[in-house]
Amino acid sequence: MISSTMAEKVVDPYAEALIALGSGQGLLDTFAADMRFIAEVLRATPELGQFLANPVIKAEAKKNLLQQVFADQIHPLLLNALKLLTDRRRIMFLGTVCRRFLDLQRKLQNIVLAEVTTAIPLTEAQQQSIRERVMDFTQASGVELQATQDPELLGGVVIKIGSQVIDLSLRGQLRRLALQLA
């Protein structure tokens, strides 16, 4: 297994090069959307990641699969970058490259990632309200929401921005009340 520090040393140059390419071509937002799509595909189909990480499988087979899966879904320049990762035997880091690219893109564009957990799915109006409040709170120029559901919250919302957690859930309120009564 490769340490996270070593992975960063391997991944950072590729993520930074993709940021530079996207910025230079005016495609940064397109690349970011494509990277989110790639990351989601990797999350939804772990077999794809296993196939790409398998050192026994030839690079040509991996590039053919990348072509089949992503050709009509992502920008051709980004697809070429995935093939380059394959040729350089770095394709096993694709998920990490996606995460690092998105981190750099958010930092470059002053966008914060807000991980929002609720008991039930949020409406578009609720999502917009959360975005506005997070923007006011962080002074960011934009907010990217990652919404998940956890029925154990009972109600309310938990918002995580970086290392900061804002717990406005019923479960959190009950826990704080229990601590006060104890």
UniProtKB/Swiss-Prot annotation:
GO molecular-function terms, A-Z: proton-transporting ATP synthase activity, rotational mechanism
Cellular localization per UniProt: Cellular thylakoid membrane
Main location per the UniProt record: membrane
Alphabetical UniProt keywords: ATP synthesis, CF(1), Hydrogen ion transport, Ion transport, Membrane, Thylakoid, Transport
InterPro entries: ATP_synth_OSCP/delta_N_sf, ATPase_OSCP/dsu
One Pfam family from the record: OSCP
GO cellular component: plasma membrane-derived thylakoid membrane; proton-transporting ATP synthase complex
NCBIfam families reported for this sequence: ATP_synt_delta
PANTHER family associated with the record: ATP SYNTHASE DELTA CHAIN
Family: Belongs to the ATPase delta chain family.
HAMAP family for this protein: ATP_synth_delta_bact (MF_01416)
Subunit field text: F-type ATPases have 2 components, F(1) - the catalytic core - and F(0) - the membrane proton channel. F(1) has five subunits: alpha(3), beta(3), gamma(1), delta(1), epsilon(1). CF(0) has four main subunits: a(1), b(1), b'(1) and c(10-14). The alpha and beta chains form an alternating ring which encloses part of the gamma chain. F(1) is attached to F(0) by a central stalk formed by the gamma and epsilon chains, while a peripheral stalk is formed by the delta, b and b' chains.
Function: F(1)F(0) ATP synthase produces ATP from ADP in the presence of a proton or sodium gradient. F-type ATPases consist of two structural domains, F(1) containing the extramembraneous catalytic core and F(0) containing the membrane proton channel, linked together by a central stalk and a peripheral stalk. During catalysis, ATP synthesis in the catalytic domain of F(1) is coupled via a rotary mechanism of the central stalk subunits to proton translocation.
Name of the protein described by the UniProt record: ATP synthase subunit delta
Taxonomic source organism: Synechococcus sp. (strain JA-2-3B'a(2-13))
Gene of this entry: atpH
